[in-house]
Amino acid sequence: YVGSFGDIAVFSFCQDKIISTGGEGGMIVTNNKKLYENIWSLKDIGKNKKKYFTVSKDLNKFPYLHDSIGTNARITEIQSCIGNYQLKKLKNYIRVRNENAKIFFNKLKNCKHLIIPNHNSQITHSYYRYTVIISNEKLSRFILMKNLKKKGVACTVGGCPTIYNEKYFVEKFNVNKKNYPNAEYLKNRTLSFLVDQTINKKDIKKVCNILLDQINKILKNKN
């Protein structure tokens, strides 16, 4: 199986991911037959897979197929067609994302206020987004994002590393955030930029120039 170091790997086909199935969607892969059958049942309203594919042809017999509770998470045929066609473009999408990420790397590598992903020619990164870490504690991500958006730069927070602050985890596990200092540090210091195939390379260079300019202006006002 692909893309995993465990029993199960999960892929998202949401509209902003590397490839999409028309807005929403996803895929689970596993080499564990029992897990596969349980997952299949869960996505198909709790149906028993074996019963479903060996259903009696006796029209007088009602096919009782549901052995458990499940969800209606079945992908549609049109979504599958979109996903299959997107797979043909995947290599090109990743190539373009790497080219765009390299522009970010070359433009930002000398900025001492940011930690950026290392560019390694021996590794092919998928670059869902280009995420940087703000290393200068005098530099507020909130102010930087606000200024960038005023300049028309599309950017988002770099993710949510502190998922233990979600209500479910708080009530279920009573997590102590002191046990996760790295996550606490990153939650307010990451910033992500788009690198997909719809982004013009000139615009990426412009984004980098605006980013560096705004960093310098914010820090200058701090001194």
What is the predicted role of each segment?
Residues I8, G23-E24, I69, N188:
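Alpha-helical hydrophobic/aromatic positions enriched in membrane-embedded helices and signal peptides
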Residues F5, E24, Y130:
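Acidic, glycine-centered active-site loop in nucleotide-sugar glycosyltransferases
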Residues Y1-T21, F62-H66:
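Conserved active-site segment immediately N-terminal to the catalytic lysine
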Residues N31-N223:
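PLP-dependent aminotransferase class I/II
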